[in-house]
Each structure stands twice: as structure tokens, then as C-alpha cells.
Amino acid sequence: MDSKFKGEYSGTKSVSERHLIDQVNLQTYLNENLESFEEISSIEEFIGGQSNPTYLIKTPSKSYVLRRKPPGKLLKSAHAVDREYKVIAALNKTDVPVPKAYLHCEDESIIGTEFFLMSCVEGEVMWEPHIPKATNEERKKIYQSMNETIAKLHSVDHEKIG
């Protein structure tokens, strides 16, 4: 699909003051924990979302997505980025289309909060369920793809994959 589906909550922006990341610490950590990780060329914050700050991390040849707990005092059970990472990493063992989970970091000294890193998957966020800018044929293809993905997800043996 082309960009006609992008809305006001799509894309990236400069990282907000509240969500700044220590790029030097992050670079050092990723160099030590990911084989052949390149120099970070940019970090941007995704627009939209409700809970965990999410960033687009670019290197010269690859893009990644970093999700972290927000800064500040949090409820112990809230913002479970460890659970998000475990689910995505487990689904990497299936045919459910999810990003590649690279690593999970509990060490808050790296960027101030726990985080995980995954591949960046290009696509469109469909904020309106009826997809008003889509033609009937486009809408049909989108719904069919969504239904196929949900069916794959429901067929996963969660005990087998962890």
C-alpha cells in the first residue's frame, strides 16, 4: 500500500526531552551484545502509541525498533517490555509474521530503563477499522491478510514455543 493510509499518529519525530536516550551507552551496549552491530546514525521516536516509548534506530544498512519502559515511578506489573520481548521471541519460531527479536536488556544503567530491540518491519498502521481511504479491493486484501495472520496466531502451540 502507498502512504495514503498514514495518519496523524504515524511516522517518527525527534526524541522528546522526557524520552531521551544516551546514545553513547546504547551504542556501547549493542556493540558488545549484537554481532556486527554498526554505528547508530539516528534515533527517532515513533509518533502515537499509549504506553512504552518506541524508537526507530537507524544504522547505515539496517533499521531497528527499540521499546522501553517509560522513565519515572511505575506500577510493578505495568509496562512489561520483558513480556513483549518473550512473546515476540517465541513467535519468531513460528510462521506468524513478527519482527525478529534481537535482545532484551534489564540493566537500567544503559538508557535509564529496561528495553528490548527488534527488527523494523515496514508497513502501515491502520488506525480506522473501516480504512476509509482504501478501495473495496484494497480493503478486502487487508482484511484477508489480517484474518490469515490471526488464524496463524490462534494455531500456535504456546506451550511448545515457550
Model features per residue range: what roles?
Residues 2-39:
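Juxta-kinase regulatory segment immediately upstream of eukaryotic protein kinase catalytic domains
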Residues 40-162:
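ATP-binding pocket architecture of kinase catalytic cores
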